[in-house]
Amino acid sequence: KLYSLNTFKGSFGYLWKENIRKEHLLNVTDIIYVSPQNVSDLYQRQADTVPALQRVIDKQLIFGPTYTYTYTNTMRKRKKHTFYFKGGIDLAGTITGLAMGADVKAGKEEEILGVPFSQFVRLEADFRHYMRLGEETQLASRIIVGSGFAYGNSQQMPFIKQFFIGGTNSIRAFRARSIGPGSSKPVETNTFLPDQSGDLKLELNIEYRTTLFSIVKGAVFIDAGNIWMLNDPTPEKNFSSKFLNDMAVGTGVGLRFDLSFLVLRTDLGFPLRLPYGDDRWVIDKISFGDGGWRKDNLIFNLAIGYPF
């Protein structure tokens, strides 16, 4: 056991439906407190040399208003084009930081109950389009864009509010939270890999879905994306005008078992393009007959429900 994180969360707000398609969620205040417990010596030694590991076990106090808007017309099954949109804004520590004159860059870091509170603005949008191709076929696509900016009492976004990419519901050809930031290579430690996190996120997915027989449905997909930092000492981690060159790309196939009360999903993905290195496109290296290639590149995902 490396560490434990105790998380306490509370919120007060309003949820209302404008109509069957539109929903608003306004939390007047959303409070999150994260406290690390039982951090092992092994983990602490690694954290002393890898900042990404240290951020995981930092105490975090986050509070402030949040707002989320959701629109969907996907309930119209016979319609050729349907859409889903979810957008949100998180304003943490804004009023408190201004009232207390917090400015960590000027050496004025303010605390509440002995813990520095986070101050940031976070925006995220998730847009999906579903195109009905036939009675049993569909083309589904999604784009996710997210950005977070820390200021005032914070030098960086708190770990739990940063962005992650890769895994079962993301870029399925890469392991969960293993991509980025930017063109940086995965951090190597002697024992484990940290979750890769960033201040910016761009993800694109497209999936062709069809019924094979009875309750079994098939899918072919392509996923792409990455995360970036805004102001990291390591240049390759930061967002730049060359961000498209940092994109990880993967593809694969999957089966979905529609059991009426739930959908059991399996996906098998492999990378087409790495976000780092000199030779990033790896299509010419695909070799299904090579056991070594399969071990290093094939990623199996098991999940409940559709990825989007």
Label every model-predicted segment:
Residues 5-6, 20-26, 97-101, 151-163, ...:
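Outer-membrane beta-barrel and related beta-rich outer-membrane complex signature
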Residues 85-89, 127, 141-143, 206, ...:
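Membrane-embedded beta-strand positions of outer-membrane beta-barrel proteins
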